Amino acid sequence: MEGIQISQNVAILIDGNNIERSLEAEYGAESRMINFEVLIPRILRQRGLNRLIYFREGQNISSRLAEKLHSEFHGSVRPCHKSADIPLSIKATQLASKVDTIVIASGDSDYVELVRHLKSEGVRVEICAVENHVAQVLIDEADYYYTMQKSDCFGANLPQQRSVNRRPGTQSRNKKR
């Protein structure tokens, strides 16, 4: 694809509680926070970031996290009354006409209908989740799936790995629309 410039606007919507629980269950308590400086460039792959929103249940939200997302990615943290499912779904629906791609960082099968709806609106939908904590139906419905790795977390003692984008148990895939 030499000489071809792909210009896409991407919104990344993170279900913070789901991802934090998944990372902690998979890698331990010291690795439950996302290292955004590693993960976001891996997801974007030279595409433009339109929005980055971290949805988090409750009022105990780190001001350092909010400041970091705002200063480095012009992102924000949205506190949620209960689960992030409904606020994230509403925001994704609102953004559908403004972006080319929406990345949902969650393994929760509750987002399957949202993925189907966004795709019917012509939006490319990608899922980013921890491999053993993602619903297979969510992977199947998405246009693309990113495995969140230990190297995408703070506290990771492993050397930084390159992108591994695949379904659990399969070779690399990138569905075409």
Predicted regions span which residues?
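Domain-level signal for Mg2+-assisted phosphodiester chemistry and nucleotide/NA-binding surfaces
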Residues: 1-84, 94-97, 124, 129
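Nuclease catalytic cores that cleave nucleic-acid phosphodiester bonds
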Residues: 58-171, 175-176
